């Protein structure tokens, strides 16, 4: 199943199809909008194939709220595995397992169902769109691990290197398709 993709070409496709939005969501921020990438058939295929390489060997893909749902489902379909949506707090009916993490101002929670799915002992790869500060990815890895999953790694489309998210998720191995 594993193919070897031209990483420079994958990175070029991502860079070409990423829209930059100045001063969003607040002044001074250069928002990276991946919507054009995901809406482009070739862009979605290139990203899905490359993330599927990263997730090869997993028997469950965990997609993070919200664009990670799209990517995770595409990767799981390519690999022939299931997908688990790791939701923001308050979106799932009880009972749930949750993990709280720090935001710049306050806290947030991620949740997964506590019933109906058994992730104990399963090899899980986490998929998301962007690695920024690493808080969400670290919380997801902690949550899944606390529920008995073997989190083998993570794959993201875009890494904002200056925000040092990779350090926040260490020792979890993260592979990024495009780093800026």
Curated annotation (Swiss-Prot):
Compartment(s): Cytoplasm
Keyword line: Cytoplasm, Glycosyltransferase, Purine salvage, Transferase
Keyword rRNA processing found: no
PROSITE patterns to which the protein is assigned, alphabetical: PUR_PYR_PR_TRANSFER (PS00103)
InterPro entries, sorted: Ade_phspho_trans (IPR005764), PRibTrfase_dom (IPR000836), PRTase-like (IPR029057), UPRTase/APRTase (IPR050054)
Gene3D superfamilies linked to this entry: 3.40.50.2020
Keyword Glycosyltransferase assigned: yes
Main location class: cytoplasm
MF (Gene Ontology): adenine binding; adenine phosphoribosyltransferase activity; AMP binding
GO cellular component, one term: cytoplasm
Gene Ontology biological process terms, A to Z: adenine salvage; AMP salvage; purine ribonucleoside salvage
The protein's enzyme class: transferase
Pathway(s) served: Purine metabolism; AMP biosynthesis via salvage pathway; AMP from adenine: step 1/1
EC number assigned by the record: 2.4.2.7
Similarity field: Belongs to the purine/pyrimidine phosphoribosyltransferase family.
Subunit structure of this chain's protein: Homodimer.
Stored HAMAP family: Aden_phosphoribosyltr
Stated role: Catalyzes a salvage reaction resulting in the formation of AMP, that is energically less costly than de novo synthesis.
Name of protein: Adenine phosphoribosyltransferase
Provenance organism: Mycolicibacterium smegmatis (strain ATCC 700084 / mc(2)155)
């Amino acid at each position: 199943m594993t193919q070897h993709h031209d990483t420079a070409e994958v990175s070029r496709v991502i860079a070409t199809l990423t829209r930059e939005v100045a001063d969003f969501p607040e002044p001074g921020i250069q928002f990276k909008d991946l919507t054009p990438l995901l809406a482009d058939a070739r862009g979605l295929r290139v990203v899905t194939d490359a993330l599927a390489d990263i997730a090869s060997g997993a028997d469950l893909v965990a997609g993070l709220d919200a664009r990670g749902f799209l990517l995770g489902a595409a990767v799981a379909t390519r690999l022939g595995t299931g997908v688990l949506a790791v939701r923001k707090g308050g979106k799932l009916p009880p009972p749930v397992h949750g993990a709280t993490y720090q935001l710049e101002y306050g806290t947030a929670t991620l949740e997964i169902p506590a019933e109906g799915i058994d992730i104990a002992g399963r090899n899980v790869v986490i998929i998301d769109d962007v690695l920024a500060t690493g808080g969400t990815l670290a919380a997801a890895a902690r949550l899944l691990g606390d529920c008995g999953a073997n989190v083998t790694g993570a794959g993201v489309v875009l890494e904002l290197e200056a925000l040092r998210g990779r350090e926040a998720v260490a020792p979890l191995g993260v592979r990024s398709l495009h780093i800026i």
